[in-house]
Amino acid sequence: GMNSRLNIALREHNGLVYTAESTLTNYTDTSTWAIYFGCDPENIDKCLRIVRKELDKLMESPLNDRVFNAALKQIKGQIGVACDNFESYALDTAKAYLHYNKFEGMEDTFKHLKELTPSLLQEVAKEIFDAKGLNTLIFK
């Protein structure tokens, strides 16, 4: 997923960050998506350029089948593990019902994932990762 992509680009290939992650938070009428990384102050600009480059890659061309299928497999595994934690599953179910006025089980989620394609994912990336719609907050 995105966390892996960011950690490879920022930490493994360049040794610039201590940690890197992306998060998605859903609310009733909107969502926020964020990237977080921790680095030395002198590496901030370089890290921001690398993150932008990774986002641009996702916007410019669809994932190849191997990467796409590996990501789907990972997501399905994470959903399965999350469902094993009954308290977390109950909270997630309640949040989904609160936000969307409906509940979809794991089977429904997997059905939606089957409809996903690399091209569709690329189209969503073009919309979400457009630099004009992103903001940057830097804590020093």
Residue ranges and their predicted role:
Residues 117-126:
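Low-complexity, intrinsically disordered Gly/Pro/Thr-rich segments
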